Amino acid sequence: MNAFQDFELGAKLYLQCLLSLSSSRSATPSYTSPVNHAGASPLNAIAHSPVNVSATHRQNFFTPIANQSQQQQQQQPVAVPLDSKWKTTPSPVLYNANNNSSNNNTSSSNNNNNSNWEVGSNSNTHVAATAAATSTVGAQPLPPQTTPVSLVMHAPPPQQQPLQQQHHHHQPPPPPPASLPAPSAPPTSGSSSSHNSVGHATSVIRISSSQQQHQQQQQHQQQAHPHVVVSGGQTFHPVIVDATQLSVPLPPTTVSFHQPNTPTSTAASVASMSQDKMLAKNGYNAPWFKLLPHMTPMSKASPAPVTPTLTTSASSYNVVMMQQQQQHQQLQQQQQLQQQQQSPPQMPLNHNNNHLIVSAPLSSPGKPLNCSMNDAKVAAAAAAAAVANQRQKQQQEEPDDQLDDDVFETTTPGISANSKKQTAAMRLPTHNSNIRKLEECHDDGAAGAPATSAAKRRSQSLSALQQQQQQQQQAGAAGTAAGQPANKKIRRPMNAFMIFSKKHRKMVHKKHPNQDNRTVSKILGEWWYALKPEQKAQYHELASSVKDAHFKLHPEWKWCSKDRRKSSTSTATPGGKASGAAGTGDAKQRLVSVDGSDSLEHDMCPSTPGGSGSCGGQGISSDLQGDIIPLTIDNYNSTCDEAPTTISMKGNGNGKLMKNELPSDEDEQMLVVEEEQQQQTVKKIDLHCRERVNDSDMDDTPFDYRKQQPEANQRSAEEHSTSGANGQAINAPPLSGGEREITLKPKAIKAHPVLESNMLPYTQMSIYTQYTSPKNPIGVTPFQPTGGAFKSMPISPKGSGGKPEDAGSLQAHIKQEDIKQEPPSPYKLNNGSGSASGGGVVSAPPPNSGSVGAIFNFNVPTATALSQKQFHYPMHHPHRSPTDLRDEEADREEITQGTKSGESSEKDKPALDDQERDEVEEEDEDEEDDDEDDEDDEQFMQELASVNASAGFDDLVPYAMPKVVITPTPTPPPVATIVTPIKRKQFTIVRSLTPLQPSNSPHQQLKHLHQRRGETPPTVITRVPTPTINHFTIIRTQQHPHTHPHNTPPPLFFKQKVQGSPVIATVTTSTLSSSSSNPANNEAPNKFSNFPTQHQPTTTTTISCNTNNNATPIIRKLLTLQEGAELGGSHKGTGRAAILYDALVLDTLHGQDEEEEEDEGNAEKQENPKVAGKEQVTTSQPATMLLITDVNAYNQQHVAGNAATPVSGAATLRPVSFISINACNKITLPANARILTAATATSTAAGAAVTSQAGATLTVMTKASAATNHSSSNASDITITAASAAPVPTSGSSIVMINSTTNPSTSSNSTSCSAAAHQACVPSSPAGMGLGHAANIATPPASAPAQIMGGGPASQKMFFAMTHPYTLLQRSHQPGTPSLEHLQLDAFAPGGYTLRNHNGLSSLPPPVSAQPTMLLHGYPPSHGVEPPARSPSYKSMPSTPKSATYLMSAPPERGMDGGMSGCASAAASGGDESDIDADGQQFILAPTPAQLGRAPLQRRKNLSQSKSESNVSFGANLGASNGQHISRKLHSPTMMESSSPIIGHVNSSNLSSALPTPTSSTTTPNSDEQLPLTPTTSSSNSNLNQQQPKSPMKGAPGSTAAALKKKNDEMNNSVLKQVDFEKKYKALPQFQPEDCQSPSAIAVPSSPRVYGTNYRKKNTAPPPVQKLMCEDDSIDEPASAPPTTTQRFFGPDFNNELKELESSDQTGRSPRTPKTPLQSARSDASEKGHRKVLETRRSLVLQLFAEHGNFPTAQATMAFQSKHSDVFPRKQDLQLKIREVRQKLLGQASCTPHSAGPNTPSDSNSSSTTLSASSTSLNMQTTSAADVFQYY
């Protein structure tokens, strides 16, 4: 180990030197192939040794040059592990490598660069070291490697010295290098291959910032001879050649350098390594500084080609230490390699060679030191010293070697510190070609981000900059990660045009509404261009004064926007960039790093490597530096440089570190890992690394906190480092903490490092690419942004897949805390859950469950999240696993006889779900996320199915929380999840299918929520994905008045009025109908609508009674999946997320649930007696019954016998996800199932007529109705009137919510048979609901969540008038009885509406009574009124990530707001839609991509999550499809009166959490509020939810943004105040567009529409356009005078009018961006040809739209594509063009908001509705429906 340590020290020194040199030289042997890197023999490594070292530091590789045999020896031992690891993780990110510490390190570096770099192992001795050393890590881009400083150490172990020499001999021949590059390319994929060239070095390790350093360290430590270690280059990329080869170790190398004898060299290097650690502490300053002096000459001396000298290229330093003998050969080889590599992209080796051979490039020490300025100086000095001392020290070698190593170590601190800066620079360089870009420096606060950059770009000395940065960061920004970014983020002063834009943007928006920002900016540019010089002068004057004031205030400020952007990008980017992790925090971190370098130069020099590179504190760094380079690495790429050393030091620990690095940006990971590593060497490193890495990279704060702790830790870490693998990981992070203050600033993005780290391991997240791919088996955590804006966002499902449990639990943990919003808010629960579980990730595919949840996490109610967490089988103690579920099923059997049915249903459901998913996928083909979602959903469904089978509902422990926030958890898939109320405390969750989510998260979330709320979180029915059609849940109406001690007043909207538990009669078409008749399904909705219509009066009556009686109407929150699973396959797709739980309802249920959970056995039974007196029920009857039955299973079991066997059907129906109302607090209604607040008549009719109509429909009546019929049986019993239902399988399944009073008799009659059976199934079936889930109902309509909120008096009224989610969408059912259909749609919307009415109106009950009619919705009236406001939000909601998709499932949503989108909704509320459109015309800006959750980052997060979430989001949105109006209606009405505050609260808190992403609207079941994407949503919500929703809404999306903006503004306020900005600003001249002489400036066609002159000529529109232009003031001028480039900023072709004309023009021309002045002249034939193709495609797509509507079905799309395969060779081409054209068309529509929201949702809805809609929607397409779904 001493030898290795020496080597490590030497390696560190070399790395430092190389960093100083800042050129990455792939030394000799590089690992051969990414896959076989371990397997690759040293020869292979050597063969691939040359790595391009290009300006991009990021990819610097430093490969030790060792003879092949040496490498083989060293590599081989570890080769196998590495190989396997690498093979396991071919990608550069070697998360797997973490398994073997050495492998991990190497892998880490590989992982960091997203190319597959092979890690070649040089070291024989230590596996970890070998892994690090042997593994050659390819950096993403070879060029980046050039940038990073590379240290080439050739210090083979004594035994290997001869080999090394031989190796050198081998190397010298050009052929090997020549061949090497090629082989390297093949072995490594992508950049990997070029990096393989780097592979020449025995080990080229591309180490991510921290990991790389660790790896290198490990390599040095572990390898007797250091091979060239190529660091990812993100920090600094040292190339460590065998000690022998490195015979000129910079200081340490020097020893090796002079000593030709490998043994001595090796010993020296090993000694140096060991000493390095020790010297790191002792010799940092003195040796370092000594080295610096040496280095100075050295850098100048570096040119010596033959002598291994440290040569510094302009961009980077390469310190190459070679034995003199080998040097020659090496130099020759290197030269050859250099040539080869230079010619190829692979320059690392070349650079190394260059440095060795060609000192000219390397000779410029200042810049070569890419480290901070100080680093550069230090590096230069070090290089000079190294060169000068190389020979001297070589001679001195042994003792000096160690001293040199120490010096080098010191250098490492110094250079390493510099290196760190360099590393940071390198990392940045890795990101960017240049080693350290000032930006990076800036970004950096970056250790090396811009050593060279700093040299190049910084006006101030690094030290000054660093000091300033440190001061600033430490001052306040450094204090908190979040705080830091704000402080650290100094907005650049506004220039004249920015001020002008600020002043006129509103005017432009006013003048040219509905223009995208790009066009608006162009118009502003035109205006500015037209502004008179004297007016412009005033702007310039003000701008210059602002700038002066700015620089006075921030003298250190540099405008490195590009670098900053890149660094942040890199951060966001997969670890491919060493600083990627640092990226987000990178800018700050790098800056810190730079500061660190400076500090290093000063006292901190020693610590710099750690501190500046990775360590938070320089001091810490210095301590650790010698000992723990990894610390440095952890924090930064610069750390990376040292990381290898540290790695060797840490040896085994490193591997883990590598993993961590890989997951997060290398730096982050290293940091995180290090701390974690000490704690958890391997396993935890992954997770912790992810977490910690995130913390370190993303959040300086965590490190800042640790910094102070960690300073001690750093020392201990140093010691650990010294000791070896122990403290490496942990110590490194502390170091980071210490210096990190500055460095960590960028981390501010992370919300709470603690939470975040707990929540999700950022390290994993850091590399997005690795989410679930084999590349990062580690289970890279999906990216979780931590900015205030993202706090509520769920982790990306991608990453969490790897470690669902950890991620989930962490996530849940953090999310809970993060999401702490108002505890009472159900959404909060949801949020917490969603956020925490990633989860709300119910929709998350099982694999990603933890991170699932795209932005919509919040959508999923806590229950969902919980369920997700529970999904995680580990977490699912109540339901341990899908298999366990069956056991639970047994439990459930106690509750319900239908367990078997449930199981089979579950099984069926998965199939259905899959089908649905497939359908949905087809439907949503246009939707990018949908496919994934579908897949995820399928998985989820399957899992759910497994889980569903046994829904053993534990008796929930009733909590005495008056407002149990039951967060509605939409079930992502339409799988009927068994919602088993796991102890209420924990939350009753339907067992989630996503096992990935750690089980703890759901519980934790619930607990947190409980703690927060002080109320037990409502048992949240985890998202109950009802299998589309088959699964329907009966809403359990809970009566808060229920005698239950815990009975809380109906939370949210259920007020005492609603106390009487409403009877819900759910009539679902039996599966029979679903399977036997899709038409029946379609028909069913019609019938249902008819039926409800028939029974409307009764309903009204009932409602009145119920409203008064039932304090808590049945949970309105009905998570219904699309009904179409079996029925109209189309419904299925919708169904998956269709289940929405009304958070309010949930709350209500929770209040009741608590009662009922306690009483699940009791309360329900009590309810039975109460039910007996249905009217009595009003007081005590908690009519909360959730019966989620797998209709599919039921149907499948009773395919034709549903009607025939009502009772058995009931048993079968035994809700797979039978959520007893109390247990689930949420009801998942099948899409078909409509809960109508039909009065007795409805109930009766519903039970009888509906059932008959619905065909095997089960009527689940509330206890009251059940009581009437089954008063003896127990109100609890859920009566499934299978027989009644069976008779009319054809009718769409409808859930009739019957007033407890009226319906009971009829309902009970129909339902009596099944009631008993169901009762068995449902622990508390007091609701006495008849579940008739025909296939139609089985598919829970997305809109199924009909609010059965008592609303006011008509609380009972909440009906889920969702016969079919699609059916609803498809007004086709309505045709027969459009009013009913409308009603149903309205039921959804009205549910929401009803709630709304309830909220706003007690009259809602009348509407409800009118419910059968569309009016009930208020679709025309109520809906029309409210939807308009909502419609935009709905629209936006659908447009939210998968909201649109969910919309499919949200026919109600369509019906509701843009429900129009939904066919049924459109049909039913077609008028409404128009109203909304017209109404909703209220101009609402189209949601931004971020709001829609479509921003790249969100998209990444949502990829998997979105898929599952698309289901969830549906439900979660409650506003999305179902949820849209339902969530609004459900939520708002539910919460309206009593719970309005809650909802408001929920909304506000949820919004806050949800806020981060518009999806948050979907995220929180709160739905509409969260739909907050659009103002309408907020207004609608506020309407429904009274003031609160609005505030929350506004607060939500706006508040976070506003808060952030506020912070930023505050930053500028001081500057602006100094300038008296406001006064002067107001005095500025106002531009008068009329005065504008640039016609185009006035006319504002959207820029994209503007065509070149050629097009204009082609178009008939041009003359009018010109006329239009002429109409404008100065039209004549441009027209008359030939347009000159100077005349108009955007050129003659830019004119808004033209754009407008052309947009209206249906010629099918594709829009083109405005041409620059010369563009039209440039349009040559080739361009024309291309344009012609584009135009052809556009016209064809328009043709397709004309034939099939804006949302053509998958079948239509495929057929069209095959028909026009010449134009659309691939289906993707057509889909993309469809999406593009549709977006343009919708964008042009006057109702942008509406289009954006409802249409998009309708798009996804339509996709899912396509199936159901195909049957139903076709029948009944009202105006809106026709418009939206005519294509179906």
From Swiss-Prot:
Residues that bear Phosphoserine: S41, S49
SUPFAM superfamilies, A to Z: HMG-box
Biased composition (Low complexity): 96-121, 187-203, 211-223, 323-342, 446-484, 1092-1105, 1462-1471, 1547-1589, 1800-1817
Signals that turn on the gene: Subject to local inactivation by the RAS-RAF-MAPK signal transduction pathway, which leads to relief of target gene repression. This pathway may be locally activated by a variety of ligands and receptor tyrosine kinases (RTKs) according to the developmental stage and tissue. In terminal patterning, activation of tor by the locally processed ligand trk may promote cic inactivation specifically at the embryonic terminal poles. In the developing wing, activation of Egfr by vn may lead to cic inactivation specifically in prospective vein tissue.
Biased composition (Pro residues): 172-186
Chain intervals with Acidic residues compositional bias: 397-408, 915-938
Protease listed as a keyword: no
MF terms (GO), sorted A to Z: DNA-binding transcription factor activity, RNA polymerase II-specific; DNA-binding transcription factor binding; DNA-binding transcription repressor activity, RNA polymerase II-specific; RNA polymerase II transcription regulatory region sequence-specific DNA binding; sequence-specific DNA binding
A GO BP annotation: imaginal disc-derived wing vein specification
Keywords noted in UniProt: Developmental protein, DNA-binding, Nucleus, Phosphoprotein, Repressor, Transcription, Transcription regulation
Biased segments, Gly residues type: 610-619
Predominant location category: nucleus
Residue numbers spanned by region Disordered: 66-121, 135-227, 323-353, 389-427, 444-493, 563-619, 690-739, 784-845, 874-938, 1069-1105, 1151-1178, 1457-1602, 1632-1668, 1701-1733, 1789-1817
Composition-biased stretches (Basic and acidic residues): 903-914, 1724-1733
Superkingdom assignment: Eukaryota
Classification via InterPro entries: CC-Dev_Transcription_Reg, HMG_box_dom, HMG_box_dom_sf
GO CC term, one of those recorded: cytosol
Pfam families with a match to the protein in the record: HMG_box
Keyword Phosphoprotein applies: yes
DNA-binding region: 490-558
Subcellular location as annotated: Nucleus
Residue numbers of Phosphothreonine PTMs: T1716
Task performed by this protein: Transcriptional repressor required for the specification of numerous cell types during embryonic development. Required for terminal patterning of early embryos. May associate with gro to repress tll and hkb, restricting their expression to embryonic terminal poles where they initiate correct development of head and tail structures. Required for dorsoventral patterning of oocytes and early embryos. Cooperates with dl to repress zen and other dorsal specific genes within the embryo and promotes expression of the ventralizing factor pip in ovarian follicle cells.
Assembly: Interacts with gro.
Matches recorded under PANTHER family: HMG-BOX TRANSCRIPTION FACTOR BBX, PROTEIN CAPICUA HOMOLOG
Protein name, entry field: Putative transcription factor capicua
Organism, as annotated: Drosophila melanogaster
